[in-house]
């Protein structure tokens, strides 16, 4: 006689069922992060496509900004709310739009909709990288690297306008609109002479250089022991051996520069560190601009240029350009302020 003794199956809660379904191995992983990422990305992209296709910026900026009005991909945009709206979230059911969708679009409600859903969508994408890295048991450096673009997006589209008078001063979501915002940053904040911008440029361009050098070096030192017709068929994806020779690469760059990375860990960490640090420095600089912190000022050159008509430097010439940007842009962008600049404040020659 055989007696089978077993434990009764524990009752599974709703959380366990949801966890199993969300983290199931499927073609497109959903995960808990997907609950944030997927709806937010859908709404942000949908709001942007809706705005650039149908919605005018006549009521907020006095501009045409949609395909319906004759714009193209480079000139269409979802524009920021008008200056009078301040930092209102412009909820569809709020006191401004009062659940009127047309009025909500006219007031710039799509911009806050896209900005907020876009921010949470980017955060959801970073959490997705954390979640999948944990599931497949690898380090989470991809997610850490993606914090750089998130920091830049949040600082430019949310923190900067929060430090200014309203969402009006944030960039609109469009190609030409972003270019105009860059000119605005230069004219009103002298952004190119800001040390944080300099660090950001060094990080991004330095990363591009590192990426090009690294890719070329790996291609140059591939082992030719495969039978395939090209690089992509020559190796088994699960091979145990190295694909390229680090020793040969080290010898090459030692001869070129006199120094070279001695191991792959330091090399690849450096390639991670340079662009991410550049992005974070840029984000910190924009946070400073939100508080109206100034860039470098070389006052001695300004005073001498004002006193001596024959003295000029590239710095003083750029200052005149910035003054011109401010004089033209302020009156154009803020007609409601009725800004009238007297002749003596407009740029003339090299007199500051």
From Swiss-Prot:
The modification Phosphothreonine is found at residue 2. Keywords: Acetylation, Chlorophyll, Chloroplast, Chromophore, Electron transport, Iron, Magnesium, Membrane, Metal-binding, Oxidoreductase, Phosphoprotein, Photosynthesis, Photosystem II, Plastid, Thylakoid, Transmembrane, Transmembrane helix, Transport. InterPro entries: D1/D2, Photo_II_D1/D2_sf, Photo_RC_L/M, Photo_RC_L/M_CS, PSII_PsbD/D2. It catalyses: 2 a plastoquinone + 4 hnu + 2 H2O = 2 a plastoquinol + O2. It is found in: Plastid, Chloroplast thylakoid membrane. Chlorophyll a ChlzD2 binds at residue 117. Gene3D superfamilies: Photosystem II protein D1-like (1.20.85.10). GO terms for cellular component: chloroplast thylakoid membrane; photosystem II. Chlorophyll a PD2 binds at residue 197. Fe cation binds at residues 214, 268. The D1/D2 heterodimer binds P680, chlorophylls that are the primary electron donor of PSII, and subsequent electron acceptors. It shares a non-heme iron and each subunit binds pheophytin, quinone, additional chlorophylls, carotenoids and lipids. There is also a Cl(-1) ion associated with D1 and D2, which is required for oxygen evolution. The PSII complex binds additional chlorophylls, carotenoids and specific lipids. It comes from the Eukaryota. One of its GO terms (molecular function) is chlorophyll binding. One of its GO terms (biological process) is photosynthetic electron transport in photosystem II. It is a multi-pass membrane protein. The modification N-acetylthreonine is found at residue 2. A plastoquinone binds at residues 214, 261. Photosystem II (PSII) is a light-driven water:plastoquinone oxidoreductase that uses light energy to abstract electrons from H(2)O, generating O(2) and a proton gradient subsequently used for ATP formation. It consists of a core antenna complex that captures photons, and an electron transfer chain that converts photonic excitation into a charge separation. The D1/D2 (PsbA/PsbD) reaction center heterodimer binds P680, the primary electron donor of PSII as well as several subsequent electron acceptors. D2 is needed for assembly of a stable PSII complex. 2 of the reaction center chlorophylls (ChlD1 and ChlD2) are entirely coordinated by water. This is Photosystem II D2 protein. The gene is psbD.
């Amino acid at each position: 006689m055989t007696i089978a003794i077993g434990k009764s199956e524990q009752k599974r809660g709703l959380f366990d069922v949801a966890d199993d379904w969300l983290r199931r191995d499927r073609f497109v992983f959903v995960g808990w992060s997907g609950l944030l990422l997927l709806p937010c990305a859908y709404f942000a992209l949908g709001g942007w496509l809706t705005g650039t296709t149908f919605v005018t910026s006549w009521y907020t900026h006095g501009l045409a900004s949609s395909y319906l009005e004759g714009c193209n991909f480079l000139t269409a945009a979802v524009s920021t709310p008008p200056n009078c709206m301040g930092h209102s979230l412009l909820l569809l059911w709020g006191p401004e739009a009062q659940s009127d969708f047309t009025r909500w679009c006219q007031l710039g409600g799509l911009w806050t909709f896209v900005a907020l859903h876009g921010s949470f969508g980017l955060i959801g994408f970073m959490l997705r990288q954390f979640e999948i890295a944990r599931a497949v048991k690898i380090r989470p450096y991809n997610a850490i690297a993606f914090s750089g673009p998130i920091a830049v997006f949040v600082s430019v589209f949310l923190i900067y306008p929060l430090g200014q008078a309203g969402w009006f001063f944030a960039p609109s979501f469009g190609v030409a609109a972003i270019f105009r915002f860059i000119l605005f940053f230069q004219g009103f904040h002298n952004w190119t002479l800001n040390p944080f911008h300099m660090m950001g440029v060094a990080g991004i361009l330095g990363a591009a250089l590192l990426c090009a050098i690294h890719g070329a070096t790996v291609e140059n030192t591939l082992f030719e022991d495969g039978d395939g017709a090209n690089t992509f068929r020559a190796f088994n994806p699960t091979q145990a051996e190295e694909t390229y020779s680090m020793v040969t690469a080290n010898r090459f760059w030692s001869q070129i520069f006199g120094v070279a990375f001695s191991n792959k860990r330091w090399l690849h960490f450096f390639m991670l560190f340079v662009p991410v640090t550049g992005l974070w420095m840029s984000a910190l600089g924009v946070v400073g601009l939100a508080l109206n912190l100034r860039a470098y000022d070389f006052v001695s050159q300004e005073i001498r240029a004002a006193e001596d008509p024959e003295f000029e430097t590239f710095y003083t010439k750029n200052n005149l350009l910035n003054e011109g940007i401010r004089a033209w842009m302020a009156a154009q962008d803020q007609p409601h302020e009725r800004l009238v600049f007297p002749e003596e404040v407009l740029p003339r020659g090299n007199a500051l």
